[in-house]
Regions:
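Hotspots on structured nucleic-acid-binding interfaces, especially in canonical RNA/DNA-binding domains
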Residues: 7-108
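Extended alpha-helical scaffold segments
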Residues: 1-12, 49, 114-115, 120, ...
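Short, well-ordered secondary-structure elements
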Residues: 61-165
Length: 168
């Protein structure tokens, strides 16, 4: 299978930017174990990275239509800041509209996926790998779906999002 990333990594500058965008969120010596105690830090670091690389700009992947079956029609829910308002099925329906295409949204999903995977410790990867069918779409890595699985598996114990996340 040909990597989606090849097309936009033709120059050294683009490769450097790509590797910066997909760096682990945590410092290398402190990876994310998918534990509740690390979750707020994980989400804060993800929020910073997502803003930095434009994932939360209008028309980008983190802004999920309330009805993902009708893409690009609002109102929109910010997946990174309001993750508890979306089910995995809504996220998957949204990501299916662009995953595997040769465009920025598909590339950003792949970038998010790689950054998240590089952030997980061995323990975190072991918890997440069993749900591979939930974060892969037609053989493609789906960044938002992976994020939703990570959130669910982190067993959040804060705020009112607990019941929503556990049910989804």
């Amino acid at each position: 299978r040909k990597s989606m990333t090849v097309g936009f990594l033709r120059t050294a500058a683009l490769r450097k930017a790509y590797y910066h965008m997909t760096e682990p969120l945590f410092p290398q010596q402190k990876m994310f174990d998918v534990e509740p105690s690390q979750f707020p830090t994980f989400m804060n670091l993800l929020n910073v990275r997502a803003r930095d690389i434009g994932l939360m700009e209008p028309g980008q992947i983190a802004l999920v239509p309330q009805d993902p079956a009708v893409p690009n029609v609002g109102p929109f829910i910010n997946m990174i800041e309001e993750y508890g308002r979306l089910t995995l099925e809504q996220v998957r329906t949204w990501e299916t509209t662009f995953i595997g295409h040769n465009d920025r949204m598909s590339q950003n999903s792949k970038i998010l996926f790689e950054a998240l995977m590089r952030t997980l410790s061995v323990t975190g990867l072991q918890q997440i790998q069993v749900w591979k069918n939930q974060y892969m779409i037609n053989g493609h890595d789906a960044g938002l779906c992976l994020l939703k699985v990570i959130i669910r598996e982190s067993y959040l114990d804060s705020n009112a999002t607990v019941s929503t996340i556990c049910m989804n």
